[in-house]
C-alpha cells in the first residue's frame, strides 16, 4: 500500500512537471493598440522594418471598401497601391486587381508580397484572379504576378505565404482542400503537394471549442484545413498546421523543392511535432522562436527551438488572433473575430467593432 501511494505521488508529480514544460508562463507582455477599424473586417498585417504598417481586408461580405491599405495612425488608412487596384467588380479580370486579399507579407529583404485567393465570400475564384503578387519597393507598382489558375480548382482558397529570399521559392497553404503550394519564383513553375494529407487536413476528432461551445457551421463542426505557415530563419524547414486542431507539423524545404520526389516519398518526410494550440497564422523570429496564437484561449504563445511553449500574453481583446508580422523588435497581431461571424452563430452576426491590430515587445 505504501509503495502504491509513493508511486501515485510520483506519477502526479511527473505529470505536473510535463505540463509545466509544455507551457511555461514567464510573465505576460502588454498589448499596445496600433490600428483599429470600426467598420471593415481585416485579416492580414504586415509591418515594414522602420516603416509602413499595412493591413488587408478580404471580400467576405458586402460590408467592404478596400482590399489593402497603408495605415496612418490608429484609424487612418490609404488604399494601396492606389484606389484603382482596389476597385474590382464581378465580371472583370482579377489579374491586375485585388479581388479578395487574404494576406500581406514582408520578406526579410523588405519586399512586399500580396496574396489574393480571389474568392469573394469564400466561394469560387473569380476573374482568374487567384495570385501571389510581388510589389516593387521603389515604385509601389506590381513587379510580378504569379497566377494560380493552372493548378487550382475554382473552389480553392490560398491562405498564407512565406518566401525564401535566398533560394527564391515561395510556400503557401491552401485551406479548402488542404495542401501546400510550392512556387519557383525565378521561372514561375508551381505545384501542389501534400494534398489532403493528414498533416494538411484538420483532425476530424478534434473538438474546436471556443467561447464555451464547439464552433459549428450548417449544423456540423466547423473545420479549417492547412492555414498557418512559417519558414525557419535558415529556410531549411517549413512549419505548418491545420487551423482547427492543435497539431503542428514540419518538413524540410529541400524535399518540397525537389519535383522528382513522388507523393508517397514526400509524405514520408513530414514530421509530426505534437500537440500545441489552435492557431491561425504563425511566424518565426530571427532567433528561431515560433510565435502562434491560441484561438481557444485568447492568448499568444512562443515555442523555442526545444518546443517549450510559453504564454506571452492572454487577453480578452485577442478575438481570433489572425496574422502576424515581426519588425522593430515587436510582434504585430491582427484580430479578425472570425468565430463571431454569422455562419458560425446560426445566422446571427456577433462581431463588434473595432477590428484591431496590436503589438507586443519580443
Name what the model sees in each region.
Residues 34-66:
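Beta-strand-rich domains and repeat architectures in extracellular enzymes and scaffolds
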Residues 185-189, 251-262, 362:
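Short loop/turn segments immediately following beta-strands, especially the blade-tip
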Residues 55-61, 114-117, 172-176, 232, ...:
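Conserved beta-strand positions in repeat-built beta-propeller and related beta-rich domains
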Residues 39-50, 92-111, 115, 151-169, ...:
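Beta-rich, blade/repeat-based domains predominating
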Residues 76-86, 143-147, 191-206, 258-271, ...:
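Beta-propeller fold detector
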Residues 16-19:
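C-terminal motif of bacterial Sec signal peptides marking the signal peptidase cleavage site
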Amino acid at each position: 500500500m505504501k509503495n502504491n501511494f509513493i508511486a501515485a505521488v510520483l506519477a502526479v508529480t511527473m505529470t505536473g512537471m510535463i505540463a509545466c514544460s509544455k507551457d511555461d508562463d514567464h510573465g505576460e507582455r502588454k498589448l499596445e493598440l496600433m490600428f483599429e477599424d470600426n467598420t471593415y473586417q481585416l485579416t492580414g498585417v504586415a509591418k515594414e522594418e522602420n516603416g509602413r504598417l499595412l493591413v488587408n481586408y478580404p471580400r467576405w461580405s458586402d460590408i467592404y471598401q478596400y482590399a489593402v491599405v497603408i495605415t496612418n495612425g490608429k484609424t487612418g488608412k490609404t488604399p494601396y497601391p492606389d484606389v484603382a487596384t482596389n476597385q474590382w467588380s464581378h465580371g472583370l479580370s482579377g489579374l491586375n486587381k485585388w479581388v479578395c486579399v487574404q494576406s500581406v507579407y514582408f520578406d526579410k529583404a523588405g519586399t512586399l508580397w500580396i496574396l489574393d485567393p480571389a474568392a469573394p465570400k469564400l466561394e469560387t475564384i473569380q476573374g482568374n484572379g487567384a495570385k501571389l503578387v510581388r510589389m516593387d519597393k521603389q515604385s509601389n507598382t506590381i513587379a510580378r504576378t504569379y497566377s494560380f489558375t493552372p493548378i487550382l480548382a475554382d473552389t480553392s482558397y490560398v491562405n498564407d505565404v512565406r518566401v525564401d529570399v535566398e533560394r527564391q521559392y515561395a510556400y503557401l497553404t491552401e485551406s479548402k482542400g488542404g495542401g501546400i503550394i510550392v512556387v519557383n519564383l525565378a521561372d514561375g513553375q508551381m505545384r501542389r503537394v501534400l494534398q489532403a494529407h493528414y498533416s494538411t487536413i484538420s483532425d476530424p476528432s478534434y473538438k474546436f471549442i471556443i467561447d464555451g461551445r464547439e464552433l459549428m457551421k450548417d449544423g456540423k463542426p466547423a473545420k479549417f484545413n492547412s492555414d498557418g505557415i512559417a519558414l525557419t530563419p535558415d529556410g531549411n524547414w517549413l512549419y505548418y498546421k491545420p487551423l482547427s486542431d492543435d497539431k503542428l507539423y514540419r518538413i524540410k524545404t529541400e524535399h518540397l523543392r525537389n519535383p522528382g520526389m513522388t507523393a508517397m516519398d514526400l509524405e514520408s518526410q513530414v514530421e509530426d511535432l505534437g500537440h500545441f494550440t489552435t492557431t491561425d497564422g504563425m511566424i518565426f523570429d530571427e532567433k528561431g522562436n515560433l510565435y502562434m496564437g491560441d484561438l481557444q484561449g485568447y492568448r499568444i504563445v512562443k515555442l523555442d527551438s526545444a518546443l517549450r511553449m510559453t504564454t506571452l500574453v492572454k487577453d480578452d481583446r485577442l478575438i481570433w488572433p489572425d496574422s502576424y508580422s515581426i519588425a522593430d523588435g515587436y510582434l504585430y497581431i491582427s484580430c479578425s473575430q472570425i468565430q463571431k461571424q454569422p455562419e458560425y452563430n446560426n445566422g446571427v452576426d456577433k462581431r463588434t467593432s473595432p477590428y484591431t491590430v496590436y503589438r507586443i515587445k519580443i
